[in-house]
């Protein structure tokens, strides 16, 4: 290649390089423009997004303000004694007041206690003058408690000692006296206003164990609460839980102490607020309680009983005040089919009022002794207890007062 050819070849190379450099510049400019365009687009998009978000926040703020305004307009007007939160002077000058917690009103119940009720007879008695004969003759279950019904329906709870059985069993036990009545005799109690019966006594099994079970079944079916032995009961009386316990002492004496302790604890565990213990104890025809009666009664009070009553002597005994609680040692007979003409017809209805406030017994010293006769006929037993009046009432009250004075010396 000569020099001229070399020069031409060099010029072509320089020309190509200039041509390529120009193209590169164009490409670079295009890339730059595209980059700028993208960047500007991003800026515009970000600005639009920010504006949209600001608009949304503004709308939400307006909506919230509108809701608050509506709530303020619908809020009940405060009374003049309320504190204005925006008025610091008023707020500082007014004392904050609090509403006291409501307390439960005291609730009082009156309980009536009566003694031995034998609704039936012994098959060996003269049936012409028996309890059953009067039932058939009167043909009215309401006859027997007719003269005391107003008292029993006016109280809150009436409790009796059910001295006998209600059964159709003929399995009479070998004993001097065995009492049974027809199961329909439950109507005597329901129509008379009796709500609960103690069954822990020496006549509850007169026709065998089945007669005892029958008596429970028929009484409970009639709506009458039963208790006694190891069967305690807790009744709801006007919202007050009343625990009922029946103890049969005649055979075991002081051997019943543990049962007293256990049964009282049992009704406590069931929430009893008032506890009544009914003892079948003592000596027949005796107006003076023995040492076993006193020991068991005091134990019951010490363990938490609020009232102790007794029966079995068939006559009245005194009332002792022990640790502020009442012990009625014997209520005597009441509606008693076990004797066609008892020589001592004196009896009573013992009433006590218990007041409970905020679940606690706060008062139990209101008592009422209503002297009665177990018969409304003086010459024989017509099995219809009645309230005594006048001199007879005063005589029985005086008797109870004398018996009680000896116990409270």
PLM segments and residue spans:
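Acidic, metal/ion-coordinating pockets
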Residues: 2-12, 25-78, 87-409
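Acidic, low-complexity cytosolic linker/stalk segments
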Residues: 16-17
């Amino acid at each position: 290649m000569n020099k001229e050819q070399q020069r031409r070849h060099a010029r072509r190379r320089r020309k190509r390089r200039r041509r390529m450099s120009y193209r590169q510049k164009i490409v670079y400019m295009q890339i730059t423009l595209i980059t700028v365009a993208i960047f500007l687009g991003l800026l515009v998009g970000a600005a639009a997004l920010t504006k949209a978000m600001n608009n949304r926040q503004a709308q939400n703020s307006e909506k919230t303000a509108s809701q608050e305004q509506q709530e303020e307009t619908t809020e009940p007007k405060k009374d003049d004694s309320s504190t204005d939160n925006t008025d610091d002077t008023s707020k500082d000058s007014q004392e904050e007041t609090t509403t006291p917690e409501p307390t439960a009103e005291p609730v009082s119940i009156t309980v009536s206690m009566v003694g031995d009720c034998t609704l039936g007879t012994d098959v060996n008695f003269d049936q012409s003058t028996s309890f059953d004969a009067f039932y058939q003759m009167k043909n009215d279950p309401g006859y027997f408690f007719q003269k005391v019904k107003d008292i029993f329906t006016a109280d809150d709870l009436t409790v009796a000692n059910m001295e006998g059985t209600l059964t159709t069993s003929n399995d009479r036990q070998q004993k001097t006296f065995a009492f049974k009545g027809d199961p329909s005799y439950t109507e005597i109690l329901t129509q008379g206003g009796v709500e609960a019966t103690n069954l822990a006594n020496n006549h509850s099994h007169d026709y065998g164990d089945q007669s005892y079970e029958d008596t429970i079944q028929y009484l409970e079916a009639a709506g009458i609460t039963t208790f006694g032995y190891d069967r305690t009961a807790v009744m709801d009386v006007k919202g007050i839980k009343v625990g009922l316990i029946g103890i049969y002492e005649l055979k075991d004496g002081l051997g019943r102490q543990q049962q007293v302790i256990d049964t009282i604890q049992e009704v406590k565990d069931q929430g009893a607020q008032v506890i009544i213990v009914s003892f079948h104890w003592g000596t027949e025809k005796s107006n003076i309680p023995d040492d076993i009666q006193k020991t068991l009664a005091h134990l019951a009070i010490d363990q938490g009983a609020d009232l102790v009553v007794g029966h079995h002597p068939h006559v009245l005994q005194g009332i002792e005040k022990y640790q502020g609680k009442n012990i009625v040692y014997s209520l005597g007979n009441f509606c008693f089919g076990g004797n066609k003409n008892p020589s001592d017809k004196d009896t009573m209805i013992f009433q006590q009022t218990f007041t409970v406030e905020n679940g606690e017994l706060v008062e139990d010293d209101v008592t009422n002794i209503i002297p009665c006769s177990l018969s409304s006929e003086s010459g024989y037993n017509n099995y219809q207890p009645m309230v005594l009046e006048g001199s007879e009432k005063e005589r029985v009250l005086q008797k109870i007062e004398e018996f009680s004075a000896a116990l409270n010396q």
